[in-house]
Amino acid sequence: MADDFDDVNHQLEKLLRGLKIMKIKDVIECLKSEGTWVRWNRCTRDRVLFGDDDQEVKKIGVCWVATNKVIEQALEKGINFIVSHENIFYTTGTHLETKLVESIEHKKDLLSKGNICVYRCHDVWDSIPEYGVSDVWAKKLGFDFKDRVINS
C-alpha cells in the first residue's frame, strides 16, 4: 500500500504536461476532458467530495477508496489532492448510525488537517481506454482486443 500513490502518478503526469500552474480544478478539467462518454450535464458520480478545488496542487494521490489509512498516508507524504474511484463517505450499511457519523467526522477531520481535496473519478475511470477498469480486466484475463465494440 505504501507505493500505491507513487505507482499511478506517472499516468496523471502524462495527462498534465503543459500545465504550468496547476490548480486542483485544472487537473479535474483535464480528467473530464478524457471522459468524452460521460454526460457531464446529467447524472455522473464524478465530483469533488471534500475540500477546495481552487488550491494549487502540491502532490496527487490516486486510490480505489480514500480510507482513513490512505488519508493518513497522504498526510505523511504531503499530498493535498486525492483522486478516489469510490465514494469516501458511504452512508448505508448495517453500522450503528452514531458510529457511522463518528467515522465520517473523523475522516473529515483528517482531510481538513491536511487541507486535502478529494475528487471522485468513477465514470471516467471505469472506461478510460488502456487504464480503465474494463481494459485492465480484459488484459488481466488475457483477452486480445484492439477495438472496442462499444464505448461504455
Where are these predicted regions, by residue range?
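Targeting/processing segments of secretory and organellar proteins
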Residues: 2-4
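Hydrophobic structural segments
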Residues: 10-152
